[in-house]
């Protein structure tokens, strides 16, 4: 029976699964890595931390010759590589909000209506295109060294194979893909004066994109499929592959997701329209701080504890938290409030509130935020 290796490069950590062809989990491993916040609203990681985590997980799985490998992970991030394939600077992540001016620059250079017609989305601070412009505007020395721009999961593909490649679902979140035609937009790249050779070949999610080069605990020659952005990949796994089926996924962010009949721009700007991993299209509403809000709460109010105590105290608190309300906009927000400057807060706090009330209010704030997006 075939054995398949799945790799997920998340924001808080990576996960690797060994599956059989029926989808049964044979082995699994995970590893955490740090998140850097150099300034409020900024969010960065070292791509080497992703790679080291994936290597540890592959070693723990202990299967050197799976029949195929699939890659998924956090979307939108920008990994800048030089002519030697080395990382130029820490990656700017999906929840990094520093690029508001560059989003305005994109609309000014391309035209707001054309941007939305081509990409089916407004330029958003989390997307890759404004991050590339930010690097050009603010770190010209680093920008001058760039020869390739990858998404996070595609950096792992590169380290496994030596091949630069991406696929349609993740590339949709760059702000540079022609979403209806499912390939890079020369109009966007030309208007923004970006070198098309910096952006890798785009595959469909189910196409073979590369083969392992050997090392890192894996044999050479194992096919690596295109894979998918984390949300599209999760939707395939949960069956959200046809219109009328809705999925909700919770990680560092939270997403409400549904397949749609074709590419159509949401004129309210609240939902994204992307290529789906099943060769169709999908719409999704993204809330930036879901599990991320809980991790912040754990690290801040429960230092040294795992989530078990946090969950226990939150469960013991009364629904409504005696009037305490938490707004979970810790890194700005996208859906339905597209505002990178939005910030979280507690309101209704009084002396009678306990740590458990604070914990439960975070859960409730996340739940109502997702309902707001729905």
Sequence positions of predicted segments:
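Active-site core segments that coordinate phosphate-bearing ligands/cofactors
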Residues: 5-7, 100, 107-120, 124, ...
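A generic structural motif
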Residues: 31-32, 94, 288
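N-terminal glycine/serine-rich phosphate-binding loop of ATP-dependent small-molecule kinases
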Residues: 1-89, 101, 117, 145, ...
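Glycine-rich phosphate-binding loops at beta-strand->alpha-helix junctions
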Residues: 13, 204-212, 228
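Gly-rich Lys/Arg/Thr-decorated short loops/hinges at beta-loop-alpha junctions or inter-strand turns
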Residues: 34-41, 114-115, 165-172, 196-198, ...
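Conserved beta-strand and immediately adjacent loop positions that scaffold enzyme active sites
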Residues: 15, 77, 173, 246, ...
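Residue-level signal for inorganic ion chemistry
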Residues: 23, 46, 69, 96, ...
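Short beta-strand-loop/turn "lid" adjacent to the catalytic site in phosphate-handling enzymes
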Residues: 59-94, 119-128, 157-178, 201-204, ...
């Amino acid at each position: 029976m075939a054995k398949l290796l799945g790799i997920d490069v998340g924001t808080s950590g990576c996960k690797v699964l060994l599956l059989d062809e029926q989808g049964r989990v044979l082995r699994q491993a995970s590893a955490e890595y740090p998140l850097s916040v150099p300034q409020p609203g900024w969010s960065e990681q070292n791509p080497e931390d992703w790679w080291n985590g994936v290597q540890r997980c592959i070693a723990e799985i202990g299967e050197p010759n799976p029949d195929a490998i699939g890659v998924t992970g956090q979307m939108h991030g920008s990994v800048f590589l030089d002519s030697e394939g080395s990382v130029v600077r820490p990656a700017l992540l999906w929840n990094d909000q520093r690029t508001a001016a560059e989003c305005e620059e994109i609309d000014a250079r391309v035209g707001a209506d054309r941007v939305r017609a081509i990409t089916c989305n407004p330029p958003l601070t989390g997307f890759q295109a404004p991050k590339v412009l930010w690097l050009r505007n603010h770190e010209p020395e680093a920008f001058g060294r760039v020869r390739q721009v990858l998404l996070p999961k595609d950096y792992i593909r590169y380290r496994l194979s030596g091949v630069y490649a991406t696929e349609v679902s993740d590339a949709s979140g760059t702000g540079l893909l022609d979403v209806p035609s499912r390939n890079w937009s020369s109009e966007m790249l030309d208007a923004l004066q970006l070198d098309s050779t910096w952006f890798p070949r785009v595959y469909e999610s189910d196409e073979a994109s590369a083969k392992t080069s050997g090392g890192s605990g894996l044999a050479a020659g194992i096919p690596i499929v295109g894979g998918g952005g984390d949300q599209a990949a999760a939707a395939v796994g949960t069956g959200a592959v046809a219109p009328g089926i809705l999925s909700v996924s919770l990680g560092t962010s939270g997403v409400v997701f549904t397949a749609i009949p074709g590419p159509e721009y949401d004129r309210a700007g609240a939902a994204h329209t992307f290529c789906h991993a099943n060769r169709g299209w999908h719409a999704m509403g993204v809330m930036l701080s879901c599990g991320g809000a809980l991790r912040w709460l754990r690290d801040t109010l429960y230092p040294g504890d795992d989530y078990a105590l946090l969950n226990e105290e939150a469960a013991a608190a009364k629904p409504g938290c005696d009037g305490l309300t938490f707004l979970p906009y810790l890194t700005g927000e996208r859906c339905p409030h597209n505002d990178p400057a939005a910030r979280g807060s507690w309101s209704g706090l009084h002396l009678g509130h306990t740590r458990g009330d604070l914990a439960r209010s975070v859960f409730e704030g996340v739940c109502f935020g997702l309902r707001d997006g729905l």
